[in-house]
Amino acid sequence: MSQKNETTILILALAITLGLLFTGFWLFNGVINRQKDQPIPPFTGSLEERISLGNKILVNADRNPNKEAGVTAFAKVDFPTAIAQLESSLKKKRNDPEAWIYFNNAKAAENNPLKIGVSVPIGGNLNIAKEILRGVAQAQDEVNNNGGINGMPLQVEIANDDNDPSIVKKIADKWVKNTKILAVVGHNTSDASLAGAPIYQQGNLVMISPTSNAKKLSGIGSYIFRTIPSISSEAEVLARYALKTNRLSKLAICADSQAKASQSFKEEFIAKFDNEGGEISQIACDFSEPNFNASAVISQAVSDGAEGLVLAASVDKIKRSLDIIIANKGRLSLMANSTLYTIDTLKFGQSEALGMVLAAPWHPEAIPDNPFPKNARKYWGGDVNWRSALAYDATQAIIAGLK
């Protein structure tokens, strides 16, 4: 097939596919609007050091001798050696998504592959980056083991954007200029996606974010998609739970004034909660406040008569949400958006996080007989979370669009 001149067909297919992939939220204990490109500010470090098809390791935490030998061979275009070494690496650490992607890229290299990109915050939040990569890696492996896309295997180029908007713009610009990149899975935070989306839109390159749900992303253009449901849906489900199930009539809310998704969630939650007859405490709680004091926030909320506290967490300020959880000591009922669904919440919140209610766009037990969770356990040795599932959906949507 031709390369980017097939994008219109891809967009039509994606529009249909993404409509089928909507997952909803669960609680548990055609005209292109071209925009001018924004200036791309400089950043420290070489862009080439941040992008790899298999010629360099980006996730330094997962280095081992076989993986290093594999990427060295890949860089020398010695694909048989790369395949053998990366396969040996995966036998030692099967749940390494970067190694899976490079392994499949090496196998696809000499078979007229189709290429996409995935951009994740390896240097910003490694756990989240690997969660997204797992979904992409699984979708790539499955399609390549089943004949590829019209007989052509899929390659995935990985970029590390650190969730830094200035770096995102550089990566987006590079991929738009690379006619072999047919679509992009990314980015993670809404601020990152909002930085890259106008560049992809102007360059007619499809971008699908599995995790960005800020309201502003929806209006950028017809090449911009996401697999995560709207932030309004997330806020509505949590607000209804607080009032109807948990019977909390007055809540305090913490958000990050510097993160668009966090602010979007706060605005939507307040509107939904107010419409249902609830009351929002007027205490100030901003995760970006330089002198943020979690204990003071809890004390002020209790003094103001709040019965619960909603955490509109942001990826860059997750630690401050965890500080709130630890400082709470069970005094307020805690609820949070899907951003706080991370391993760090369990690791650092521990017993203080018990009873907290999270909104999530996907859960392995939410859809009976869904084959994805079972297959994911075989790949990764345990359950995956919503970021992996929606990254898998994003990649599957691109695959469907390219067929």
Model-derived features: where do they sit?
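Beta-alpha junction/loop-to-helix N-cap segments that form part of ligand/metal-binding clefts
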Residues: 77, 93-113, 127-131, 149-216, ...
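An alpha-beta-alpha
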Residues: 140-141, 222-287, 307-308, 398, ...
